[in-house]
Amino acid sequence: MSHQETHGFQTEVKQLLHLMIHSLYSNKEIFLRELVSNAADAADKLRYLALTNDSLYEGDGELRVRVSADKDKGTVTIEDNGIGMTRDGVIEHLGTIAKSGTAEFFKNLSGDSAKDSQLIGQFGVGFYSAFIVAKRVEVFTRAAGHSADEGVKWESEGEGNFSVETITKAERGTKIVLHLRDEEKEFADDWRLRSIITKYSDHISIPVEMYQEGTPERDGPDGEKIPATEGQWKAMNKATALWTRSKSDVSDEEYKEFYKHISHDFADPLDWSHNKVEGNQEYTSLLYIPAKAPWDLWNRDRKHGLKLFVQRVFIMDDAEQFMPSYLRFVQGLIDSNDLPLNVSREILQDNKVTRNLRQALTKRVLSMLEKLAKDDADKYQQFWAEFGTVLKEGPAEDFANRERIAGLLRFASTHTGDATPSVSLDDYIGRMKEGQEKIYYIVADSHEAAANSPHLELLKKKGIEVLLLSERIDEWLINHLHDYKEKALHSVTRGDLDLGALEDEAEKAAQEKLAQESEPLVERFKSALGDKVSDVKITTRLTDTPACVVTGEGEMSSQMIKLMQAAGQPVPESKPTLELNPTHPLVARLDKEQDETAFAEWAEMLLAQATLSERGSLADPSAFIKLVNQMLLKSVG
């Protein structure tokens, strides 16, 4: 006898439903993911309980989920032959938010039995996602092991009340019928549903089936009879999770094809790493390094991150919580048995478990790159050409792994003689001169400007290698990478160029003598240039150039000033230090100049030339041109 009752949802369910529908789920199609996931839960739950009570199968052990659509009626139906629900279970689990029965089921498990149960979904918000697209939802269910007349029908429009009615249901399990809103009728389409199943549920271990219509008998192209076929239910998902298989059972081709499936990339990946971790946290990761950078790698709004699965059920794309920004090029997935999620299952809880997973996966990627660099330099060079600039963000972002990241960096160098960034810091250290204590580098606007900078003259003469940095991010990188393996990184354009043990006592004595002899010249330059410079000094870093400008210790470099100006940031006023090469013929000639006006003009000329050489531009180029023209006029007059 049918027995119908009307119940009110528990406290504030109406408001919670409204919040979830309009705020928590921005992607409407995930209603199917949630309902298929719940259906697979029910099948997995039955499979586990049937291990100790085979009669629960009722003679039907082929577990499956079936999805169908009726365009005329505007409905979508999701049906499973899983554990089903009793009347009390329906009222409890479909009358509350954040509770689906699965969480209660987990509480009844203990010890190793929990490991063996392939169960997911620890809360009940998922079912209510049906109301994102449905104006009315009907649920028909019967619990396994109960009689046919103990079936239950649940119905609601999601407005605060639901009805529960006793019905007769021959088959165990649950059938959910969604009566779609007029504006959501697009989902009452087989092809639309198939694409969603393939996207979200491809790797659920339970087959997710849709009905494939039969075909009548027909004539073939050569007049032969093609027999009729019967309609049948056919699995839309692969029902296998590649990453759950042993690495030895997966071929390279399968790994490559799976990469293309999850990344939508047409090219093979450069490398991958497949790992299963057991212990306090149990998870499997499958991480890929692409061969090519995506076109929008530098788009600030570009989504990145790993695909997140819980027990092989797809939860979300772009789970960026598991990978730092400087590794945003990494593709792949993480599949966790016990990862905590918040109420919506869309946003990961930022807790200790999540942070530990992030740290472990970051180290895994760095290990991949270290191995690639060690085993296949050409392949690593290919990686660097695509993603090196992104990796340079690492030292600023990830202090804990700064040394490892630094070991992966590649630079152009005076040693190689070309612009290809192929030199590692370890390569540099291995070639350091006896007594050399620092790693020397220069940052410039271009490789040519760096390679031809006058600041390199003495170092080139002594055969000391200098790293040539010319990308916009390099100054930012160096500001967060002060040393490597106890070797300080030192800019050849900053402060005094102290070569330490690389200069003998005779050289140092000669330098001191030259500085003393040039003091009157230095004072004349200071007087002529006034507040245009912070200081004037004699230098030995120059051999072929009359003068250069350098940045004082602790001051902002010219490259950093450019970066901040480009970003619209305020920049503190700074004045360069002018360094003079007194052995250069032009400086020696100026030392003898008696006309202080002419001396001042030449001093300004040398300062402008040195500034242009180091910074690539002048604050007032028109004034410089005026000065040049004025001096040219005098020379031809």
UniProtKB/Swiss-Prot annotation:
Region annotation B: where it falls in the sequence: 346-562
One cellular component term from this protein's GO annotations in UniProt: cytoplasm
Transmembrane parts of this sequence: none
Domain of life: Bacteria
Residue numbers spanned by region C: 563-637
Stored Pfam families: HATPase_c_3 (PF13589), HSP90 (PF00183)
Chief location of this protein within or outside the cell: cytoplasm
Keyword presence, NADP: no
Record's subcellular location: Cytoplasm
Entry keyword set: ATP-binding, Chaperone, Cytoplasm, Nucleotide-binding, Stress response
PROSITE patterns registered for this protein in UniProt: HSP90
GO molecular function: ATP binding; ATP hydrolysis activity; ATP-dependent protein folding chaperone; unfolded protein binding
Region ranges (A): 1-345
InterPro entries listed in its UniProt record: HATPase_C_sf, Heat_shock_protein_90_CS, HSP90_C, Hsp90_fam, Hsp90_N, Ribosomal_Su5_D2-typ_SF
Task of the protein: Molecular chaperone. Has ATPase activity.
Recorded family membership: Belongs to the heat shock protein 90 family.
Quaternary structure and interacting proteins, as annotated: Homodimer.
Annotated protein name in UniProt: Chaperone protein HtpG
